[in-house]
Amino acid sequence: MPDISLKVLSNEIKISIQELIKELSIIGITKTEDNYINVLEKNILLKHLESKKKYSLDTLVLQRKTRSTLRISTVGGKNKSVQVEVRKKRAYVKNNKFENESFLNEKKVIKHSMQKTSSLKNKEKKYIKNIEKIELNKSDSRSLNTKKENKLKISNKDEQNKKFNQHRESNSFDLNHKKRIKENKDIRISHKEEKQDYHLTTFLHARQAEDENDREVEIDKRNHGRILKNYRQKKNNKNFHNGRYNKEEIRTFNRNKKNSKQKNKPILLQQVFQKPESIINRDVIISNTITVSDLANKMAIKSSEVIKNMMNMGIIGTINHVLDQDTAQLIAEEMGHKVIVHRENALEELIMKDRDTGNDVSAIRAPVVTIMGHVDHGKTSLLDYIRSTKTAFYEAGGITQNIGAYHVKTDLGSITFLDTPGHSAFTAMRSRGVQITDIVILVVAADDGVMPQTIEAIQHAKEANVPVIVAINKIDKTDSDIDKVRNDLMKYNILSEEWGGENIFVSVSAKTGKGINKLLNVILLQAEMLELKAVTTGMAEGIVVESFLDKGRGPIATVLVKKGQLKKGDVILCGFEYGRIKSLRDASGNEVFSAGPSIPVEVLGLSKVPFSGDVVTVVRDEKKAREVASYRKEKSREKKLSNQNRINLENMFDDINKNNVSELKIILKSDVQGSLEAISGALLKLSTEEVKIKIIGLGIGGITETDASLALASNAIILGFNVRADTSAKKIINSEHLDLRYYSVIYDLLDEVKAAMTGLLSPEYKENIIGLAEVRNTFKSPKFGLIAGCMVTEGVIKRSNPIHILRNNIVIYEGELESLRRFKEDVNEIRNGLECGIGIKNYNDIRVGDIIEVFEVREMKRIL
């Protein structure tokens, strides 16, 4: 067939050329008015137009949504509700011709079915008449048997013949019944098919069609069941017809009742709950703790039943009573259920087992050496000389305030150094440094000797069972005394090998470099004796030495690898945090792709800043790592809440006394995690019985607008350690005149907080006696009552000051003067050796010989 132009095709299908071009563009064929179309493109276009006509204006599409909730049990044993939505879509087409044809066909089918049902009813009537005749014959035979015994055999034969006929008729009834059921089914099927066609053609009867189908199904089921039941009763029971007639009479009697209309209505099927005949045994998942109500829900019984069972076992509780795992298991098993004990840390154990630990072949690793000692004894300077750097020169105040990890490669071998702070506030930091180290270098200044932090470092080393090498520093000074240092260390069981001990002593100078090579040789010799080895392949494990928040890069942790290979892109789990490693940098700031055992690296990619000392573990799945981290965080929170003091009589009185205690509220921000822990611990130790330090907020990084708003709401001071406030925070601080202080040395911070606490102390009041007067005589005054005539024996008697009245050196009254006169004139003060008259306010029991003591109260400032 030749190609057709678009104009001819538009005339054929009666569509304008513009619409035709649009339809062609929809199916991906681009044409213009002057173009031609081939046969294949024409067929595709016609199919497209037919499908478009399928849902025309005479078609109505209905959508129905049904929503329901489904409760399922999760892995943790808790019930979880899931929303289920079922969507149905139906299209109803309106076609008058098809509707009329289907309506006529339906009428024919109904007439045909009515004729068949009338013929069936006539057959049933004939069958009933035959049965009545048989029953009458049976009664006649019984009467003949009583009168004539000789005709018994004949009557038996007649009965057998009748039974045979009856059996034959029953068989014919069975066949007729089966035919009738088939015919009804055929009628019903044809009727349904016609009705389906009918209902598809019209929208007005759409819902009625569904209801009619349901009703007919129910009626057919009941009729079918009734016919089968009647046939079985007829077959097995001789009195079937009498019972049937009685039932029909009962049925006709019931029809005359008031509610007969409701009873004759067809009843649709309804879902009815049926109580189980026996107890259903369920699988009950029990966690570490569970309440009685939750346990009852999991066993699908009432809470009262669980409480009854508990009382039988000797446990008294309510629905909110919390049961431990063992008790809940006993209760559930007692009630016949199977218990599945759920371990909350099962996911953590699973994720730790699913790790590639390498080939378990150990190799020699570099020793981890921690440098410890007192403040300003030259620890960082010694390390700077070894590394050829000037770290101590740039440190604030010339003191180290966080742990620094460095890997040094020398001609003799590789060594990893950890530089710890020497200040007393950094005790926890030093203890953490000892726990991850192999060798401790105890630096003691030759001119200063053994100091408190030196003793503390010795104790930490002994607790960790780590060998100690003593480096006596500053030997280049003129006032250095090496023998004195040896004697002082001997008191703490640190003996040199020369004196028969186990510790190696090396005299060094961090300034000139004297003895440094010998110290490195001793370290490597000690490491060789310890035979330090680690697995160098597989997933890595390490420990966080220090962590901080970088403004540009985010949370950063300094990690010391213990075993395995830490690589870029690994998923790590670190305490309460997790993440994928984005970058690895060594101590010099150079980016590396992997790090082996005893190598410290800076890790970038964690969700938040971890705590120093947290264990870093490489895992496979980031999603599971997030779940374990959130589980750890939740358990830590629950532990904190459980450790809070419960209300009892003792702490109730403590809370009452707290009203007399002043609080200094502090918001603390630091640059690194270790310094934050050290400062917060030192501040809390400053608390006294009268002034308490309350840290309401602490964190790593700069001071933000949130910190300033919190300080404004809680009336707190803001302390920044090596951090600064941003622009938005400065606006709030300046406008609200908040107290913001910056520090770079921990000494200054602690001293100023002590001064602030001193200002919060309540002042002391001291009584200072300024004068004594002896009562010589008493007389009455109409205005002031009893007046004491006195002689001033010491000091000065002032009118405005308070007084004590002493009798036999015992204070019997404390009050104030009401009048002070000399020669009937009011005066303000009377000096020593003069007489005066004194009137005491609200006191008339003054006697001769009493001593009036005049004093003044002075306010004294207190010091912590």
UniProtKB/Swiss-Prot annotation:
Would you tell me the protein name for this molecule?
Translation initiation factor IF-2
Q: What is its main location?
A: cytoplasm
SUPFAM superfamilies on file: Initiation factor IF2/eIF5b, domain 3 (SSF52156), P-loop containing nucleoside triphosphate hydrolases (SSF52540), Putative DNA-binding domain (SSF46955), Translation proteins (SSF50447)
Q: Name the protein family.
A: Belongs to the TRAFAC class translation factor GTPase superfamily. Classic translation factor GTPase family. IF-2 subfamily.
Using the UniProt annotation, give all residue ranges assigned to the region (Disordered): 140-179
Task: Return the annotated region ranges for G2.
Answer: 398-402
Give the span(s) annotated as G5. 509-511
Location of the region described as G3 in the Swiss-Prot/TrEMBL record: 419-422
- Where GTP binds, per the record, is at 373-380, 419-423, 473-476
Provide the transmembrane region boundaries.
none
Q: Name one GO cellular component term.
A: cytosol
Q: What is the lineage of its organism?
A: Bacteria, Pseudomonadati, Pseudomonadota, Gammaproteobacteria, Enterobacterales
Q: Where are the annotated segments for G4?
A: 473-476
State the Gene Ontology terms under molecular function.
GTP binding; GTPase activity; guanosine tetraphosphate binding; translation initiation factor activity
Identify the domain of life: Bacteria
Compositionally biased region (Basic and acidic residues): 140-171
Compartments where located? Cytoplasm
Renumbered to this chain, region (G1) spans 373-380
Keywords from UniProt, A to Z, are: Cytoplasm, GTP-binding, Initiation factor, Nucleotide-binding, Protein biosynthesis
Q: Where is the tr-type G domain?
A: 364-533
Question: What does the UniProt function comment say about this protein?
Answer: One of the essential components for the initiation of protein synthesis. Protects formylmethionyl-tRNA from spontaneous hydrolysis and promotes its binding to the 30S ribosomal subunits. Also involved in the hydrolysis of GTP during the formation of the 70S ribosomal complex.
